[in-house]
Amino acid sequence: MKFKNILVVLNPSNEKQYALARAVRLVEEQKNETKVKITALLSVYDLSYEMSALLSSEERSEMHQQVIEKHRHAVQYYLDKYANPEIELQSHIVWNSNEADAINEEVENNNYDLVVKYTKDEEKLTSLIFTPIDWQLLRKCPIPVLMVRDGDWKHPRRILVAVNVSGEQEYQDEFNQELVETGISLAENLNRGNVHLVAAYPSAPINMAIDLPEFNTSGYENGIRGQHLINMKALRQKFGIDEDHTHVREGFPEEVIPEVAKEIEAELVILGTVGRTGLSAALLGNTAEHVISKLSCNLLGIKPSKKDD
């Protein structure tokens, strides 16, 4: 996967503009045959400009434009800073009180293939701080969304792909392949990148063992684990991934995935996201929000190209 048309969401309160820095670095490490387009989007709004009943709609529109031009001048500094002959850099400043709506409208009206946005990283906390705007974007955005916490790619560049190898639904196998292919492509684009796979499988229901004393808990769990291991082996062999780069563990995805990401010091976690039931992952049911809230690394959220019925 090579990104050709990237939308970067600027953060007006972050002078370092990590999202733009990360996007530019990603493009620089791709082997591009043609120029890559990066659009820096900034959503601005000031309620005080809407409060005056004395202003005509024309006057209000003119004031909006003045504010936009002021911010456009400030954004130009970053376009100049990251100028690169391989990149067509441009800015788009919009007046909108809802940043998430502004982003989604921009995506709907243009052929972007990636959105990059900075999300807060508190030193005293062990996870990223996702804002309501971040959640809305991950839920609704139809294209991949890269949430970053800083501006550079670390070495070694370990990419952890979360997959569902339960084999319960056919579309999951196709989606697993999409996710792994994305991870491998990014690893190839990012020098010294390597891919790990992770899958979680459930424990035996406690109430089942209580209600059915004859129920073989150990046999059930061994069977579930065995099936996940077989399916994971088939997936990793399909892509030539080493066995020691696959992780199949008992537990909830929201515990297993962040745990493995921390252990291998993952630079990026790739998750599947499906917006029809809030934010969820096809591989994770409705637990993706819990997974994401516990991650301390960058996140790439991807929706399946083929929707499940």
Swiss-Prot record:
Main location: cytoplasm
CDD domains xref list: USP-E_repeat2
GO cellular component: cytoplasm
Cross-referenced Gene3D superfamilies: 3.40.50.12370
Localization in the cell: Cytoplasm
Keyword tags: Cytoplasm
InterPro entries given in the database record: UspA (IPR006016)
Chain's role: Required for resistance to DNA-damaging agents.
Family note: Belongs to the universal stress protein A family.
Official protein name in the record: Universal stress protein E homolog
Species per Swiss-Prot/TrEMBL record: Haemophilus influenzae (strain ATCC 51907 / DSM 11121 / KW20 / Rd)
Upper classification of the organism: Bacteria, Pseudomonadati, Pseudomonadota, Gammaproteobacteria, Pasteurellales
